Amino acid sequence: MADNARPFYRVLQTSSSHEPFEVPYRRLANDRLNAFAYTDSCVGDFVKRFRELPQWKNTVIVFVPDHLGAYPEQLNNQSVDRYQIPLLLVGGAISEPRRIDVYGSQHDIAATLLAQLSLPHQKFVFSKDMLNPASPHFAFFAVPDLFG
């Protein structure tokens, strides 16, 4: 990446915070929490190293999980909390830190990012700009015996 002067798009997916929770890291006795701590440390190291590259100033890194996960173990499958996941936008191209509490889903990432770049996103008919206050803020979910 250090030699790349042209805009680029990359995807990196981790699976260290998924079962069987076996990671090369031993900080916590609970295997699940230890795997989450390992993932957090790797993400932190990645961002720390990327900040040192010249591309950082023009970069947006998107962090989003595929689903909530396996913790807390007692969380009810019918609870809204079970389906709330973070979307983090990090990078030198982000003007200032802020927290925005709206409902959305992974489908909405495309329209949200394209809108920030002032690019058309109408062809993404199932995606909405989560940062637009006029957008309807909802998220669809479906699991066995439950949807909403």
Label each residue range with its predicted role:
Residues 1-148:
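Solvent-exposed soluble domains appended to multi-pass membrane proteins
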